[in-house]
Amino acid sequence: SKKNEKKLQKGVDDPQRPCQVRCAYGNIPNKMRTKALILTAFVGALGIAGASAQVYSVNAVGYVNKSIPAGFSIVANPLNNGGNKISDVFGANPGSLTVYRFGDAGFSINSYDTDFEEWDDGDATVAPGEGFFVLNSGDVAVNITFVGEVPQGDLSNGLPQGFSIRSSQVPQEGKLDVNLGFPTDEAVTVYQFGAAGYSISAYDSDFEEWDTADGAGPVVGVAEGFWVLRASATNWTRLFSTSE
């Protein structure tokens, strides 16, 4: 068919900009200030209180704007969007994007066809905590708006032995272990890759420090994924609430 012929012609060579979090209160700076981060959605009979009052709900809904540069970068879905189907996560007409996923189920490639306005597999899921490569085949950056609920409660993200691509389950920028709770129970290496190139950060479990310039470890952005290399499996756990 015409569609299949077109897709066969899509050749891909083998191989962050800062996210902008917005809410009802305007732009939010680098560190997540949870009381101002969320465009709060109140569930059930909760009403909106006066501007001076502080009100919290069980579910907090927000959106994250991310610029995906031309070429390859490692991206993540920062919010729960229903079933986290790729067609919902990236929204309508995201541009000439191809998503490369590497996980327990193996390797998969999923492309968006701008002519037919559909993904190869629009039902494929990309949940918070997972990282994946994105190839933007266009000449300019593509702006994606992620919409959904902020993950809360007891969060757990499996880190297997060997290589995996992961991200923070919470839409927060910060030092990987100090701010985001990444486990440093053993020697671990983190690989980051974006428009500006790549960086490698290694944690020395004997000296209990990273090899970064300040010794405090890599900084990870909102909706940024990264490679992790571990000698043994563990879980990246975190107890999080937007009311903190």
What is the role of each PLM region?
Residues 10-11, 20-23, 42, 88, ...:
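Detector for intrinsically disordered, low-structure N-terminal pre-sequences
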